[in-house]
Amino acid sequence: IKLFPAQLMFYDYYYASSINKIMFRLNLSKILSKINCLFIKTVTSINPTHILVFKGMELSPKSLLWAKQRGIKLVNYNPDNPFVFSGKGSGNSNITKSIELYDLHFTYNLDTQKKLKEQHKVKTELLPFAFDISQELFEVCQKEKEVLKVCFLGNPDKLRASFIEALAEIGIEIDVYGNDWNNYINHDNITIFSPVYGDDQW
């Protein structure tokens, strides 16, 4: 197994400076081109039989088609909805344009599974959310003081905001982590934080 951390490569660039963010938003950055070139070099060097893509925002349809034409099976797991983008981190055109290139999609959502099968005619399996952390990290987490609140990690959309506000209305305290939640909810029982990644999620 060889890991190719495309998303982390992008984050390292994007969050390094405000200039990088501006360059990317103005479509003047070459970071995605660099990531895709490195992806092709990596695939060429290890010649895998399968590639599992997490979400796929950084990989272009052209790069995926190149891999597919080499006989490599492409599998996608997207923890967000590939048809509804609730924020800049939840999806982009690379995801929607690449849907039919994959040999298999894993999704957490029954409606998404149905749409992938019926509209795009692609093989799809349901894979609920799950986490597997190291014993070392588990032991660190055990030593932390327990916080008796609901915790939600992810970017907002109207449905998520409505559900979270409904919980807050009945007296449940909630910590929310993600981008732009201030534009969706405002409640005394809800505390909003910036996104967290990797081990910081725990």
Model regions and ranges:
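Nucleotide-sugar donor-binding catalytic core of glycosyltransferases
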Residues: 1-21, 30-38, 55, 61, ...
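Glycine-/proline-rich flexible loop or hinge segments
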Residues: 20-25, 46-50
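Glycine-rich phosphate-binding "P-loop"
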Residues: 22-28, 74, 80, 126
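Short N-terminal targeting/anchoring amphipathic segment
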Residues: 40-58
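Helix C-cap/helix->beta junction micro-motif
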Residues: 46, 70-71
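Structural motif
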Residues: 49-52, 73, 104
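Histidine-anchored nucleotide/phosphate-binding helix
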Residues: 63-68
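A short, histidine- and acid-enriched strand-loop-helix "catalytic/donor-clamping" loop
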Residues: 76-88
